[in-house]
Amino acid sequence: MMLKPSIDTLLDKVPSKYSLVILEAKRAHELEAGAPATQGFKSEKSTLRALEEIESGNVTIHLDPEGKREAVRRRIEEEKRRKEEEEKKIKEQIAKEKEDGEKI
């Protein structure tokens, strides 16, 4: 009986079999906890679903964890800045509408 996805295919996606086991376990836990899936699945079990995601390349290991943390920090800061700019524009629009309403 051939397992799908095959171990050889999966080992092409990660640096070692130990990394594969850790990545698969973490992703399976995330899926069980309700994390959104990155694709449709053939399998019912979360462990096999995690392996399908690894095989497709949708889930990967970050070999530079500090770099990942920095990227997440930058993304959060960028989102915060965008929200602040949007709130500022909304407040300016409200103030302008009030001004226009008082002129009439």
From Swiss-Prot:
Its EC number is 2.7.7.6. GO terms for cellular component: DNA-directed RNA polymerase complex. Residues 76-104 are annotated as: Disordered. GO terms for molecular function: DNA binding; DNA-directed RNA polymerase activity. One of its GO terms (biological process) is DNA-templated transcription. InterPro entries: DNA-dir_RNA_pol_omega, Pol_omega/Rpo6/RPB6, RPB6/omega-like_sf. Pfam families: RNA_pol_Rpb6 (PF01192). It catalyses: RNA(n) + a ribonucleoside 5'-triphosphate = RNA(n+1) + diphosphate. The keyword Hydrolase does not apply. Gene3D superfamilies: 3.90.940.10. The keyword Transferase applies. The RNAP catalytic core consists of 2 alpha, 1 beta, 1 beta' and 1 omega subunit. When a sigma factor is associated with the core the holoenzyme is formed, which can initiate transcription. Belongs to the RNA polymerase subunit omega family. PANTHER family: DNA-DIRECTED RNA POLYMERASE SUBUNIT OMEGA. Promotes RNA polymerase assembly. Latches the N- and C-terminal regions of the beta' subunit thereby facilitating its interaction with the beta and alpha subunits. This is DNA-directed RNA polymerase subunit omega. It comes from Streptococcus pneumoniae (strain CGSP14).
